[in-house]
From Swiss-Prot:
Protein name: Small ribosomal subunit protein uS2
Gene transcribed to yield this protein: rpsB
Top-level lineage group: Bacteria
Protein family per UniProt: Belongs to the universal ribosomal protein uS2 family.
PANTHER family: 30S RIBOSOMAL PROTEIN S2 PROKARYOTIC AND ORGANELLAR, SMALL RIBOSOMAL SUBUNIT PROTEIN US2M
Cited Pfam families: Ribosomal_S2 (PF00318)
Upper taxonomic lineage: Bacteria, Bacillati, Mycoplasmatota, Mycoplasmoidales, Mycoplasmoidaceae
Organism field: Mycoplasmoides gallisepticum (strain R(low / passage 15 / clone 2))
Length: 323
């Protein structure tokens, strides 16, 4: 695993497998940001409320995450899913917070990546926009990092189409305008979040390294640091700074990614959304699923069958009477 080379941050070193949780927690105070002497980045109660410590089903776990999981022989370990060590979650969260703070102060390119669901896509975009960062929330296109020159050509095409839309669109025919707008919409969907990024990103922030494995692979090839929320089925060894946490629950992802975004916002002199705030000021609503509606085939159910008129129904009876 490579180290953070751009910034001299000791906390960027990966956790070694032989390191015990007790040894790791001893250095926890060193990782707390300087501005958090009077306040806590986020309380244990709030992390528990959003389910940040809940892992996946035990049968799906990755043995490489063993270091971050509460021992299976613990008395409280009776659930069907693994439980994440709360001290290690807090420790790695502070490390990531510190690193992003330094990266933002150094004017580094920070790229947020998340494509798993519509809720995650909207979350990634909102965090990037409020922190003046970059984002990719649609399907990761192969070569986004490793073939950035070709991607840059598409970005330049997007910028030209935006200029055309805003200035010269009226000189084209109606059909040409429709084609231009369709092309613009497609490019905007894939490259809108990175169209102003000058060069490669200096760090990636990812919600799910399994879903975004292509992004992780390309970043590793180019030795770009990756910060990611790693559930108990992830491989932390491929991530520069893994944060052991529940990345399946949208409330957990919303809290943790916004905290990482707050590191960037505070470094820029902007207000934080969740960081260092009391629990009552952190409102993360439950995602309400739409009720499933049962579609009835009215033809099969007999609702749309034409009923015979009274006169037509009487004719067969009259014929029988004549006979």
């Amino acid at each position: 695993m490579f180290l953070f080379e751009d910034l001299n941050v000791e906390s960027a070193q990966a956790v070694k497998a032989e390191e015990s949780p007790a040894q790791t927690v001893q250095s926890k105070e060193e990782q707390v940001p300087a501005n958090s002497t009077d306040k806590v980045l986020v309380t244990h109660t709030k992390l528990l409320d959003v389910g940040a410590f809940n892992g996946v089903a035990k049968r799906k776990w990755n043995p490489k995450m063993k270091h971050y999981i509460i021992p299976r022989n613990a008395a409280q370990f009776s659930a069907q899913f693994d439980l994440i060590n709360s001290d290690l979650l807090n420790l790695k969260l502070h490390e990531a917070f510190n690193y992003l703070t330094e990266a933002a102060k150094a004017k580094k390119n920070i790229l947020f990546v998340g494509t798993k669901s519509k809720a995650v896509q909207e979350l990634i975009q909102s965090i990037a926009e409020r922190t003046n960062s970059f984002y990719i929330n649609q399907r990761w296109l192969g070569g986004t990092l490793t073939n950035f020159k070709t991607i840059s050509n598409s970005i330049n095409q997007l910028k030209r189409l935006i200029h055309t839309r805003d200035n010269d669109l009226t000189k084209y025919t109606k059909k040409e305008q429709i084609m231009i707008m369709k092309k613009l919409a497609k490019l905007e969907r894939f490259f809108g979040g990175i169209k102003d990024m000058q060069g490669l990103p200096h760090v990636l922030v990812i919600d799910d390294p399994i879903k975004e494995k292509n992004a992780v692979t390309e970043a590793r090839k180019l030795r770009i640091p990756v910060i990611a929320l790693c559930n108990t089925n992830s491989d932390p060894n491929v991530i520069t700074l893994p944060i052991p946490a529940n990345n399946y629950n949208i409330r957990s992802v919303t809290l943790l990614l916004n905290l990482l975004g707050d590191a960037v916002a505070l470094a820029q002199g902007n207000p934080a959304k969740f960081a260092f705030k009391p629990d009552e000021e952190i409102d993360i609503p439950q995602l309400v699923k739409k009720e499933t509606r049962t579609v009835v085939n009215r033809d099969r159910a007999g609702f749309n069958k034409k009923q015979p008129k009274a006169e037509e129904a009487a004719k067969p009876a009259e014929k029988k009477a004549e006979k």
